[in-house]
A protein has these predicted regions:
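Conserved small/polar residues in nucleotide/adenosyl-binding loops
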Residues: 159-165
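Terminal low-complexity tails and localization/encapsulation signals of metabolic enzymes
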Residues: 1-41, 74, 78, 128-154
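Glycine-rich loop-to-alpha-helix module at the N-terminal edge of alpha/beta enzyme cores
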Residues: 37-126, 137
């Protein structure tokens, strides 16, 4: 694989700020469906690995929810910029792991970057609304808050597009 930035192809799990193997040390092969060549291996995570990741995410969320909208926007903008800086490598990795034509992979990643751009701007607008009530002398006030840690399943067909839309929401 001819990547400009080899550090983008890490064959480990990212849990609590660290790249790790599965506790079982078991792996599975990543196969390019277009030619059946082995692209790499990934840790075969168990329930224990998943629970560890969820616990770490909950701790991180406690910090994330305390950030201002502007501070969140800065993080999301940085992610957006990293996507754009690495679009060629990300597209190559996507093409090799799921067999999409390279132009389709670049298109999907570009489209996904539009979501990170949009969410970076929306993060600044975390204010709520005041809504008129049907009862005299009353107001309805809404607020926007982080929901918390969510489990997501991404389809093989649109892995990069699903990530920013579900991760940020």
């Amino acid at each position: 694989m001819d990547l400009k930035d080899k550090s983008l192809f890490i064959q480990k799990c990212f849990i609590n700020g660290h790249w790790l193997d599965a506790k079982s040390e078991e792996t599975f092969d990543i196969i390019n469906p277009s030619d059946q060549a082995k692209v790499g291996t990934m840790p075969n995570c168990s329930k224990k690995d998943t629970v560890k990741a969820i616990e770490a995410a909950k701790k991180s969320w406690n910090k994330w929810k305390k950030l201002t909208g502007k501070e969140r926007s800065i993080f999301i903008r940085k992610w957006h910029n990293l996507i754009l800086e690495n679009i060629d490598d990300l597209a190559l990795i996507m093409t090799l792991e799921n067999g999409k034509p390279i132009d389709d992979s670049k298109g999907e990643i570009t489209y996904a970057s539009w979501f990170t751009d949009w969410f970076a701007e929306e993060a600044k607008r975390t204010y709520g609304k005041t809504i008129p009530s049907t009862m005299q002398g009353r107001r309805i006030i809404t607020i926007k808050q982080s929901v918390g840690v969510c489990g997501i399943i991404t389809p093989v067909s649109y892995t990069h597009l699903t990530l920013p839309t579900k991760r940020i929401v």
